[in-house]
Amino acid sequence: MAVYADEKQRTFTLQTKNTTYQMKVDAYGMLLHTYYGEKTDNSDLSYRIPMDDRGFSGYAYEASCADDRLSSDLAPQEYSCFGTGDYRISALRVRNENGSQAVTLCYAGYELSRGKYSIPGLPAVYADETEAETLGILLRDPESGLEVLLQYGVLEELDIITRAVKVVNRTMGKVVLLKAASMCLDWLSGDYEWLTFYGKHAMERTLQRTPIAHGISAIGSVRGASSHHYNPFAVVCEKDTNETKGLCYGVSFVYSGEFLMETEKDQIDQTRLICGIHPDDFAWTLEPGESFDTPEVILSCSSEGFGKLSHNFHQVIREHICRGEWKNKRRPVLINNWEGTYFDFTGDKLVSIAKDAAELGVELFVMDDGWFGKRDDDRSGLGDWFPNEKKLGCSLKELGDRIVGLGMKFGIWFEPECISEDSDLYRAHPDWAVKIPGRKPNLSRHQMILDFSRKDVQDYILERLCSVLASAPISYVKWDFNRSICDKYSTSLPAEKQGEMAHRFMLGLYRVLDGMLSAYPHLLLEGCSGGGGRFDAGMLYYSPQIWCSDDTDAIERLQIQYGTSFGYPVSTMGAHVSAVPNHQTGRVTPLATRGCVAMAGTFGYELDLNKMTEEEKVEVKRQIEVFKQYYDLVSDGSYFRLTSPQDNNCVVWEMAEKDASKALISAVYQHVQTNCAAKFVYPRGLCSDASYEVSLTDLKGDKKDRMQKQVLTGAALMRGGLRLPGADSDYAAWQIYLKKL
């Protein structure tokens, strides 16, 4: 049993394998947060809450004749409200019909159930009755009648707790939600830091570690998507926490739209974290009887450092976010023509690339942007999802059949949420584009946004997508989104509901994705937003892999994939071998290094194989063989960050089988050093008393012996370390295979 409700002591305790989370109802009905951390018993932990009288921190009216020391401004609250005495960052803010913004939430009941709750129209962790339990706690404003249902999903074996909120208008009038966060989490004490993951286009999710100081710190997005700039995943940790030790808490927002994560350290050094939809673009009207569901937050806690925390998130995403046929099925090695041809291609040109790829073992050919409408550059054609048979020289079906005839699968690129001003769709439906009446729209990549908050737009796009998918043997779709949203306005919404547009857009996107996958359940969907501009748990609910970044440079990818790995498994990271000089940086890196880095992801190619030498093709064929050999480690192994690219010349990572039977260690030198010291790394996840054969993987296919095989115990490897081969040139890479004997 994972959820314990003690009606006598009025506590709710959530127990996972290694952690405990507890709440308590106080004498005045306030739901307090007492504890989240290492596993303990079900004892009432409210004794930890300080009861001190502090000036300018008020108390409830009912407490004036009793104990006036418990103030909402100081108490650790499970779901904080604006306007009634808590001056810290709040989770809920409303505008009542009389214009006031006050809300007081008091405990009104609870419900327990087996299995995991779901959220209408939104992605969420899923689990059956053997895997999860649900706790619902009902809070009510005694004055207005507004109700808030706090929902908790407990996946005991995974050390995962999920949270979501349903707000129900039980008042007699209209209520406007100005802020409705998915969670509030308070820490009574501790000197914390937090890890956030910032970036930009083509350089996403760079790790940043900063102290949580007095005042408010925040990350978020008002771009209509989770964005390249801040990822909706963060970690709060104690100061001495590292990969293998220390207490840390992870927060992942299961949402692909605008978000806000904010922390505040208050007057008595307590820390609060709020996570939810960004309130700047949000105002949701609830008529009497109507309700609003927030997106979900995934929480996990580890006392064994960032490595264990990452494993918790990797497992819940692989097993309880990713769905469908491709959740566990081996995904094909693909080649994408984008960096090989850009818009300049014909059907014959694509088939020639595919033919070379098939001979080398590539299993899926993906035709990227430029196959539809009038689309020879990025200035026109978006929205006209009809194959350009004149450009291709054949029908889409004929092209697909030719690809399939090579023994490959056929994939295709879409950008359904965007529209070109120079398109037949825009000329027919200019009101479908997102723009403010009387203002010239802001353009990005010469394109505008389709109003996915409108059901007629959703229905049209879904019909077009399904029509294209039905017309050819298409097994894969790359779903792109190449700009941020601004000029937010929908012609389908009245003025007072324009604050709903951004969230309705996201609900519309999820509806279309769900509709397409329901119609084509065998389809492999890869998410993309100019690379990693929408890399979040929400999109992973629909697409089990996401193009990690438009930056395909192997050395830059070390940083990008390192940061991404804190919250997301490598099996979700789209990673390709591209041409050199690299198209983003101009850097020339060895083919073996490019392959090694791409193998820390879904693995594929993005270049014109016709331009490769025969020696390079032999190396490509060998890379594909190696990746297939170690695929299980990539798809389901435990991932360890052995060194960081931020402070190490040699970047090393490990993927180990959960039963410790084998492991693959990959190392990339960012530059060569003269007369450098020996480099040791310390593998993890091995069996101490077992022996392992240690051998170098032949990435190049030339069968040269670059490291002598040896046999070492797991204890020796993990404590004595493994000496890596040195770098004989800039960007040298090695893969070392450990096999249990």
For each feature predicted by the language model, list its residue ranges:
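Polysaccharide-binding surfaces and accessory modules of carbohydrate-active proteins
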Residues: 5, 10-17, 21, 31-264, ...
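Conserved, mostly hydrophobic/aromatic
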Residues: 18, 165, 289, 335, ...
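Glycine-rich, aromatic-flanked loop segments that form ligand/cofactor-binding clefts
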Residues: 73-116, 245-257, 301-325, 362-369, ...
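Short Pro-Gly-centered flexible turn/kink motifs
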Residues: 100-107, 284-303, 731-738
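Carbohydrate-binding surface patches
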Residues: 243, 644-687
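Aromatic-lined carbohydrate-binding/catalytic grooves of carbohydrate-active enzymes
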Residues: 326-463, 476
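Active-site neighborhood of glycoside hydrolase catalytic domains
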Residues: 393-395, 429, 433-590, 602, ...
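C-terminal beta-sandwich/jelly-roll accessory domains of carbohydrate-active enzymes
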Residues: 671-741
